[in-house]
């Protein structure tokens, strides 16, 4: 059993991108699907699909590469961990990596990117960063 499903999912995506795999499989969790929605909206992944096999759900994530075959994900990192929660206010979420990266934030309005949280005037728990 995995203790931190988000960290496990990010590591699987990172490892698959380094190996230049077409897709990777993640454990299913609603929070992971919400994070993948943000990644998809920001253009860091091609697509994802929830698969139900023998009563167990998993997620297939299709990774995205540029025209030279390099992954569009330069770095993907877990920010808030189970032993140390990290919360960011609205003012700390304005820009990340000059707009090239995204901080995924869990807010009262759901799991959204940092720019959407700034526009919605909300802060929250910083789950992970990607650029």
Curated annotation (Swiss-Prot):
Query: Which Gene3D superfamilies does UniProt cross-reference here?
Result: 3.30.1370.30, 3.30.1490.10
A UniProt-annotated Pfam family: Ribosomal_S8
Q: Does the keyword RNA-binding apply?
A: yes
Question: What's an example Gene Ontology biological process for this entry?
Answer: translation
Q: Which GO terms describe its molecular function?
A: rRNA binding; structural constituent of ribosome
Tell me if Nucleus is a UniProt keyword of this record: no
Q: What are the protein's UniProt keywords?
A: Ribonucleoprotein, Ribosomal protein, RNA-binding, rRNA-binding
Family in the record: Belongs to the universal ribosomal protein uS8 family.
Query: How does the annotation summarize its subunit structure?
Result: Part of the 30S ribosomal subunit. Contacts proteins S5 and S12.
Protein name, per record = Small ribosomal subunit protein uS8
Native species of this protein? Wolinella succinogenes (strain ATCC 29543 / DSM 1740 / CCUG 13145 / JCM 31913 / LMG 7466 / NCTC 11488 / FDC 602W) (Vibrio succinogenes)
